[in-house]
């Protein structure tokens, strides 16, 4: 099944391709500039997907908004994750803010919300989380964003150290894309039954 995936983030595009192809989707990528003015990940994902509606017809349009929520920071950076620091040094700022937080209070989770605008303009949304902790120093060379400082529950290496094959089978983005793919497959199978 062909879908449009809206993103200007090359790392998200790579992950989405690696996740969606085995799920049976042929993603077409569309870069649309959209101000993220929503108060939630879901609101921002909907804004991004709707921004691409005029660009394509008769194909579901999917968009992602995701970020990290740190319990010791009252859920921040949250929807501000990609623009947490003014100079793009998001990890440095996060680690500085967490410098005195003991291990027991370094819990965090990634959130990924996926919005899909159907050809009939109906909007579907799903969200998923990936629980873990914030490390004291970056670890690993893979991934992107906050991956080097996120230690997923049940693992001994950061998300950046997992390798893309494993990360793309357990991450928040994988879980959300899997949920959306199931929803789309059910929708299309019932329409064509």
From Swiss-Prot:
Binds 1 Mg(2+) ion per subunit. Homodimer. Substrate binds at residues 7-12, 66, 144-147, 167, 172-173. The active site is at residue 65. Keywords: Hydrolase, Magnesium, Metal-binding, Nucleotide metabolism, Nucleotide-binding. GO terms for cellular component: cytosol. The keyword Protease does not apply. GO terms for molecular function: dITP diphosphatase activity; ITP diphosphatase activity; metal ion binding; nucleotide binding; ribonucleoside triphosphate phosphatase activity; XTP diphosphatase activity. Gene3D superfamilies: 3.90.950.10. Signal peptide: none annotated. It holds the Pfam family Ham1p_like. Its EC number is 3.6.1.66. Mg(2+) binds at residue 65. The lineage of its organism: Bacteria, Bacillati, Actinomycetota, Actinomycetes, Micrococcales. Belongs to the HAM1 NTPase family. It is an enzyme of class 3 (hydrolase). The keyword Hydrolase applies. This is dITP/XTP pyrophosphatase.
